[in-house]
């Protein structure tokens, strides 16, 4: 009986290790593809692969952080070129990638908070078509920021 329990525990440990290895390798592969696309200035496709690299998140891996940095720089690049919609899309991808890996904890809170600030700013910069008496920029920014920062549990 004792040997059966040890065999079961050993099997579970091996399966867990192999799962972590697969997640780590797939994250690195997605990051490599993204880096290649980024070097060719194909930012649209690179953002997809950086997002996937973040979604292959395991605690202790540096790949999601490196991918997040790249996505952040791409969004700032778009902002500098006055391509606000692309910057907004990239920032939302970055934010959403970390939220999609959420379970007992939320990884990438630093990046989520940075994205919340930027998204609120960009959204508030757009014309206010909803309110009869348009709100001030700061009022709209705070409204968007409060909405983005609201803690919502993951859908199950």
Language model feature labels by segment:
Residues 4-24:
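Hydrophobic membrane-insertion alpha-helices, especially the h-region
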Residues 26, 31, 38-39, 79:
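Hydrophobic/aromatic side-chain positions at a characteristic register within alpha-helices
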Residues 27, 34-35, 68, 72-75, ...:
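Conserved small-residue packing positions in alpha-helical repeats and bundles
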Residues 30, 37, 49, 90-93:
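Alpha-helical solenoid repeat scaffolds, predominantly canonical TPR units
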Residues 43-44, 84:
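TPR-repeat structural position
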Residues 51-96:
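Extracytoplasmic/periplasmic/luminal assembly and interaction segments
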Residues 56-58, 97-105, 126:
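Alpha-helical junction/boundary sensor with strong preference for TPR arrays
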